[in-house]
């Protein structure tokens, strides 16, 4: 099922359920729904008063792996340093579960997407380190920086005090995360 069909089905189920409840006398001033995919299918939002468009602002490995987004549309990236290279096919980076989270994506193995290198897998995490593998020789050395698209973009901004807006390889602005670690 494509994301447009999924969005329509979810909309129809939500609005249909609300109509059944209203017919029984229940009052609903707010009908809240939506997800990352519905942000591109606004025609299926009629009747919904509050749209929750998921991580559409960032995208992540889930939206990338399902074809909803391409790599260039994934705005959130964690920058990590290669700290150890055991051989041509295995390395350790300084981004672990505290950065990338242990959330898995059912659409592809591993704990993130190395930008520009979809063949590389982050196979294991401890708190401060990630373990990287590739069937091909790894294209980086100790000290190199790599950008990683997280499996689940919602978690990473909650773990940091600020993120940087980068355009054309230059930092354009620093964005403070005022709700960091809070449940509002």
Model-derived segments and spans:
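Active-site loop/helix belt of alpha/beta enzymes
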Residues: 1-70
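A residue-level signal for beta-strand positions that form part of recognition/binding surfaces
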Residues: 48-50, 79, 90, 129
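Generic, ordered loop/turn and secondary-structure boundary motif
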Residues: 57-59, 65, 79, 101, ...
């Amino acid at each position: 099922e494509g994301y447009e069909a999924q969005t329509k089905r979810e909309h129809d189920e939500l609005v249909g359920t609300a109509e059944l409840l209203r017919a029984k006398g229940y009052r609903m001033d707010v009908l809240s729904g939506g997800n990352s995919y519905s942000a591109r299918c606004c025609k299926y939002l009629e009747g919904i008063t509050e749209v929750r468009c998921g991580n559409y602002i960032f995208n992540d490995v889930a939206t990338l792996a399902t074809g909803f987004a391409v790599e260039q549309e994934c705005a959130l990236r964690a920058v990590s340093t290669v700290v150890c290279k055991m051989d041509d096919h295995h390395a350790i980076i300084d981004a672990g579960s505290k950065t990338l989270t242990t959330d898995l994506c059912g659409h592809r193995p591993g704990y993130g997407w190395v930008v520009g290198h979809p063949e590389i897998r982050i196979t294991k995490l401890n708190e401060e380190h990630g373990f990287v593998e590739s069937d091909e020789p790894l294209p980086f050395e100790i000290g190199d920086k790599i950008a990683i698209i997280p499996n689940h973009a919602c978690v990473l901004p909650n773990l940091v005090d600020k993120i940087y807006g980068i355009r054309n390889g230059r930092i354009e602005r620093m964005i403070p995360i005022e709700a960091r670690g809070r449940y509002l």
